[in-house]
Design a protein with these regions (language model features):
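H/E-rich (His + Asp/Glu) clusters that bind or coordinate divalent metals
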Residues: 211-326
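Active-site environment of divalent metal-dependent phosphoester hydrolases
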Residues: 13-18, 81-84, 122-126, 149, ...
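An N-terminally biased module of ancient metal coordination in phosphate/nucleic-acid-related enzymes
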Residues: 1-77, 83-94, 302, 312, ...
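Distinct, well-ordered alpha-helical segments
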Residues: 125-135, 153-161, 183-199, 215-229, ...
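Active-site gating/metal-coordination segments in enzymes
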Residues: 79-187
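Short, flexible/disordered intra-domain loops and linkers
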Residues: 24-26, 45-51, 83-95, 181-189, ...
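Well-ordered, non-membrane alpha-helical segments in soluble/globular domains
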Residues: 48-62, 93-104, 188-193, 219-225, ...
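Hydrophobic faces of well-ordered beta-strands that scaffold small-molecule active sites
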Residues: 8-12, 74-77, 114-118, 142-144, ...
Length: 326
């Protein structure tokens, strides 16, 4: 097991309010979203002062990341919009947009702490060009949320897109399961079986949230995870949000399936909370007390998973050079 400050968190959201220059967008509906309003309140971000709020979000993230005992860098994730059949941005149906240009700008400012996780909806008409542009700019993965971005990952028309990702060796990090943070239009798009096409085209796929369904006790996608892990050497899953009440059943399943640990990658789903609930009654009291006292979300995620016996890799283990499982 590797120790020290060496992990990369592959699932950290870059949040930003539109400031007139960053190209970001938030719909009126999203501004009224309960979770969105809660996050604004929790991080003390004022929507009336977007530039100040955006910098405060970054400053808070940097402070927590730099204070972590285990995590040295974070992949900042963008969020592409919805695109129509003509491949053009459909702003009317887009709830949240964090542009790749903004992601790349932040990466250039803080290269020691952050890596670029751009977002490219394969439905956009310039999707393949955007893959190459972002790869040239140093992106390390492409993140999508099909439920909210309104595309079917299994659509054969996206084969050239997946081949471009494979060519540029950019992992495809896709949300799996129900989506509650944003407004999911079609929750069936979160079925990991829809990622089979990308895998068949040679793309390295990372299933977010370890393929958990997101509906508390029912984990219907565990067999899919097991099949993909057996069939595809380029399939992985991150452990982001697995301490949440609606997803921690998958974390408990993973305790009983150590053969899957070699496919797990570290992630948190920052800025969402990390809970110690899954550890109650399952770890020594001393360990539980340490988790409760740990306020750093990156370190608590490491602690909960490791104390439960769930091992994982860091992103650089698969995109750079192989390293021992952590």
């Amino acid at each position: 097991m590797t120790t020290g400050k060496s992990l990369i968190d592959c699932h950290v959201h870059l949040a930003a309010l539109p400031d007139g220059n960053n190209g970001c967008y938030i719909s009126p509906t999203m501004l009224k979203n309960v979770l969105f309003r809660f996050l604004l309140w929790k991080h003390q971000l004022s929507p009336t002062n977007p530039r100040e709020a955006n910098q405060k979000y970054l400053d808070d993230l940097l402070t927590e990341l730099r204070a972590s005992r285990h995590v040295q860098r974070a992949v900042l994730l963008g969020m592409d919009g919805v695109y129509g059949s003509d491949g053009r941005l459909d702003r009317a149906h887009t709830e949240f947009l964090i542009t790749n240009d903004y992601v790349l700008e932040i990466i250039r400012k803080y290269p020691k702490e952050f890596l670029a996780g751009v977002s490219i909806n394969p439905q956009r008409r310039d999707a393949i060009d955007e893959v190459h542009r972002c790869a040239d700019a140093g992106a390390v993965l492409v993140k999508v949320l099909p439920n909210a971005q309104q595309f079917n990952p299994a659509d054969p028309q996206y084969k050239p897109f997946y081949r471009a990702l494979a060519e540029r060796q950019l992992p495809f990090l896709s949300h799996v399961g129900y989506e509650f943070s944003l407004i999911g239009r079609d929750q069936s798009m979160g079925d990991p079986n829809r990622l089979r096409l990308a895998l068949d085209e040679g793309t390295t796929v990372i299933a977010a949230h370890a393929c958990s369904y997101g509906l508390i006790l029912y984990e219907k996608f565990l067999p899919t995870f097991q099949e993909f892990a057996t069939r595809y050497p380029h399939f992985y899953a991150d452990i982001s949000a697995l301490t949440h009440p609606n997803r921690f059943m998958m974390l408990l399943h993973l305790r009983r399936h150590p053969e899957l640990h070699d496919r797990l990658l570290f992630g948190t789903d920052y800025p969402l909370s990390v809970f110690h609930l899954p550890a109650w009654g399952r770890v020594p009291f001393r360990s539980l007390r340490a988790m409760i006292r740990t306020k750093n979300r990156f370190d608590r995620q490491v602690s909960v998973c490791r104390e439960l016996g769930v091992k994982f890799h860091s992103l650089d283990d698969i995109v750079m050079q192989p390293k021992p499982i952590r």
